[in-house]
């Protein structure tokens, strides 16, 4: 069934709201991208959005742009270490904004939205040994 992002047809009391119009195509939503860590090569998908614009969805990520003190590096993503959005995403290697990923140069926190922006940007985390 389609994902509809319009107003609910129910009132807080549970009563029905009768719409004075039909549902519109612009109110349709889409399934989330669920960007995963790639094993072979990166996979992107171009989606037509409202107004004929385009949005790039990153389906599988192989590299991340990791920034450390203003200097950026393109490094390979190894795995997802932690994800505050959903703990099951760690097991499934799904990258979202705020996820902590393991890269070739260390751990980094994702600052971009891969399913919306089509790229993984991250900031290196300073590891403090106690």
From Swiss-Prot:
<dbReference type="GO" id="GO:0005840">
    <property type="term" value="C:ribosome"/>
</dbReference>
<dbReference type="Pfam" id="PF01201">
    <property type="entry name" value="Ribosomal_S8e"/>
</dbReference>
<dbReference type="InterPro" id="IPR018283">
    <property type="entry name" value="Ribosomal_eS8_CS"/>
</dbReference>
<dbReference type="InterPro" id="IPR022309">
    <property type="entry name" value="Ribosomal_Se8/biogenesis_NSA2"/>
</dbReference>
<dbReference type="InterPro" id="IPR020919">
    <property type="entry name" value="Ribosomal_protein_eS8_arc"/>
</dbReference>
<dbReference type="GO" id="GO:0006412">
    <property type="term" value="P:translation"/>
</dbReference>
<dbReference type="GO" id="GO:1990904">
    <property type="term" value="C:ribonucleoprotein complex"/>
</dbReference>
<comment type="subunit">
    <text>Part of the 30S ribosomal subunit.</text>
</comment>
<keyword id="KW-0687">Ribonucleoprotein</keyword>
<keyword id="KW-0689">Ribosomal protein</keyword>
<protein>
    <recommendedName>
        <fullName>Small ribosomal subunit protein eS8</fullName>
    </recommendedName>
</protein>
<dbReference type="InterPro" id="IPR001047">
    <property type="entry name" value="Ribosomal_eS8"/>
</dbReference>
<comment type="similarity">
    <text>Belongs to the eukaryotic ribosomal protein eS8 family.</text>
</comment>
<dbReference type="GO" id="GO:0003735">
    <property type="term" value="F:structural constituent of ribosome"/>
</dbReference>
